[in-house]
């Protein structure tokens, strides 16, 4: 077990301090008037308020790990069944009692606010729940760790019953955004697919193969802080969203090829659309394979980048 992270918070987490923090989030982050704010507005404001406490500890944790050049555990999984983070964040940040009272003194009901949270569409069953539990446990044990997965737009599916039959609908859990994630565009990575290998030798006769005619994709990372319980340690889960290398074909658009202009964008973003796409077709099998290759390739690049930042060689 590593030594716990020690730091002195700059935030006032008393009841009055949290009330001020919530009201500031409502005003400055959401631009909402308290008199007309909806339950969802207040849920977002209170979520962002507790996230401030968590992020302060996240930054202290990552600074400690970086300065100590610690070894990290990396956990890669196609799914993470995170559950709802609202109340869990209150407990992990050690502010549940004060936050509950602050919410009550603002004339709000905690049960009404917690009902506004959507489950993250990042996991399906046992494998995803196990992965999420591992991340929670690692943070609680003060172990340096980072999770890696895919930033699914729709997750698995939303189930409805019509006339006695199951109907599968897209689960757009990101419809209204989420206060728990932090986009990290500065750590975007590029990966390549398909293409062919050219057998090439240099002047000394060394074999130096070239990978050519590839399709390029961009992996955009989104971080979700993972606070430990009863400790200041906060690790994070990094999720990759797939984007086209070239979003828009302006030449095709100008000649009237409107579908062609966004074809690469649509094809590339399909990779992070849905958890476990139907693999009964050849295209479905290919998509599943590409999903796994995509997030592993992105994650390995990120791991190597982080290692080389603190180490000159292997």
Across the structure, where does each feature detected by a protein language model lie?
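A conserved ligand/cofactor-binding region detector
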Residues: 1-314
């Amino acid at each position: 077990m590593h030594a716990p992270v020690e730091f002195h918070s700059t935030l006032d987490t008393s009841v009055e301090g949290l009330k001020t923090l919530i009201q500031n989030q409502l005003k400055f982050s959401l631009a909402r008037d308290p008199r007309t704010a909806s339950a969802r507005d207040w849920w977002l404001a209170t979520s962002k308020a507790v996230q401030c406490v968590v992020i302060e500890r996240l930054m202290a944790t990552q600074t400690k790990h970086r300065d100590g050049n610690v070894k990290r555990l990396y956990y890669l999984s196609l799914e993470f069944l995170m559950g709802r983070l609202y109340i869990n964040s209150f407990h992990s940040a050690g502010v549940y009692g004060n936050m509950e009272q602050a919410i009550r003194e603002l004339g709000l009901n905690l049960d009404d606010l917690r009902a506004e949270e959507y489950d993250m569409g990042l996991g399906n069953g046992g494998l995803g729940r196990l992965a999420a539990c591992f991340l929670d446990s690692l943070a609680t044990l003060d172990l340096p760790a980072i999770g890696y997965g895919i930033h699914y737009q729709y997750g698995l599916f939303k189930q409805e019953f019509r006339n006695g039959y199951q109907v599968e609908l897209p689960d757009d859990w990101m419809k209204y955004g989420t206060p728990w994630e932090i986009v990290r565009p500065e750590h975007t990575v590029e990966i390549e697919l398909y293409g062919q290998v050219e057998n090439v030798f240099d002047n000394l006769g060394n074999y130096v193969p070239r990978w050519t005619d590839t399709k390029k994709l961009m992996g955009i990372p989104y971080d979700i802080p993972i606070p430990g319980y009863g400790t200041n340690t906060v690790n994070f889960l990094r999720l990759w969203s797939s984007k086209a290398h070239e979003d828009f074909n302006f030449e095709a658009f100008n000649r009237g090829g409107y579908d062609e202009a966004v074809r690469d964008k649509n094809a590339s973003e399909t990779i992070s659309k849905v958890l476990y796409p139907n693999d009964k077709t050849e295209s479905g099998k290919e998509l599943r394979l590409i999903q796994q290759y995509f997030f592993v390739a992105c994650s390995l690049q990120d791991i190597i980048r982080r290692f080389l930042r603190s180490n000159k060689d292997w």
